[in-house]
Structures are given as structure tokens and as C-alpha cells.
């Protein structure tokens, strides 16, 4: 993204490298940071094609990097905005219904996901519950609190986006400014990927109206209210482990299907319509035959008189 549009326009993505192919570039960057500020020379490593937080680790020593394994390494954001002393990120859901033209819907509701240990500036590489916000990781912590009532959407370590917004407004944060910045991140990301997906659709012969996609944007807010794009998830999990999950994700799916124009299938009604259509066809065929007209043979453009 930064290679195409420049770092100034896309400075919302932490410095990121694909290993082992870009290890040389990463190593050079690591050494420069080490000279100036070793405390901020912390990186997060994610195995390629992994999900649910599997294999993620923090490193501050280049020797801990496994250069024989395909992975993504990103600079760790060391000044996250905290709520009640905990680090969090936002799962923002985005629906794409067309790429020619690009048509994107950003859902107003989503999730704020919290780390289950109190955050400190001292980096403890082994404490994933403090640094990582992945639900699949934190639910294994004995301190994890699950939301048990969707009407209380600011309880536990997973909130609704609505609860998140209300909390920040109460402490005096300009939510209009924050969302404007977050929407800018989402739209720039979509515009960057647009030509690649258009080309793929043309090669596969996929018609632009035949598909849609729900994306999950993971966004971290730092202490300066700057949104950082951590990753974009294709087909994000729709699993519901709590009433809050069910409320948000069921609404998400219903809205997505309605916007995409997917209609409910009624088997009885559909069968009746097919019978009516077939009977109407037979009636018209019989009517044409008795009138001395031409009758088209089914499945052909050959006519018999």
C-alpha cells in the first residue's frame, strides 16, 4: 500500500515486512531503531495463513526471528489508547457489494475487544494477555470476563462499538474526529485493493453482481487518537459465544443479505411457481399448435410448422 501511494498517504499501517523474502529490509530497519530508541524496537510476528491468534509472538531481539518460516512481522504500537487500563482494538465490519464501481458499506455496530491483563509500558514478551486483544487468546485467561447480557454492552472484555463510543464521549474524546480518521483508513485500504480484485474477477469471468464479501477491519487506536490498521480479515468469524455476539453478528448478517439483495428461499412457494410456469408454458404451446402457428422445440432455435 505504501509502495503504491507513498508512506505519507498511508502512514496508518505499522512498518511491516514479509519474511523471509524481506528479512534484509527488516534487519536494516531494526538496526536503525536499535541505535535511537531500543524501547520502541518491539515487533509482533504472525505466521502466514494463521488465524485466531495462533503462533503470534512479540520480539525485541532479531535473533528470535525464525527466518526459515513464512511470516509477517510488524512494528508494535507501544502507545495504545487504554480503557480502564487495558489495551483494546476495534473490529469494524465492512460490506463490499461491487468493485466496478466500488461500493462499500461500513456497519455502524461492531466490537471492541480488550486484552485481559492490565497494560504496562514495560514489555513482557511472554504475557500475551496484556499485549494481544484476540478473543481466541484472551478467553483462555482465568481473568477473562465474558459478556452475559447484550443489554449491558460495556461489561467484560468485549464491548459493542456503541458502548465504546459512549465511553470515549464521556471522557471528552471527539468521536467525530476519531471516526473520520478511521473511515479514511478503511476507504484508502479499499481503494488500494480495488484494481487487484477487479483484475482477478475479470480473469475468473466473475460478474460484478454475482458476489459480495464481508470484511473485518482490525483497528488499533493509539494515545494520540491515531487509528492503525492491524489487518483485514476475509470472511471474519461469525461465531457467537455470547449474547452480545449474537445481537451484533445476527444483525450484521441480516443487513448484509438485505443490502446484497439475497432473498429468503421459500421452497413451497418456489415449487408452486414452477408448476404454474410449466402449466402456463404447456397452455401457450397448445394454443399456438391449435391456431396453426409455429411451435418452438424446447432448448433449440429450430421451429417446426
Report the location of each language-model feature.
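Glycine-rich phosphate-binding loop of ATP-grasp-fold ATP-dependent ligases
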Residues: 15-17, 38-66, 81, 90-91
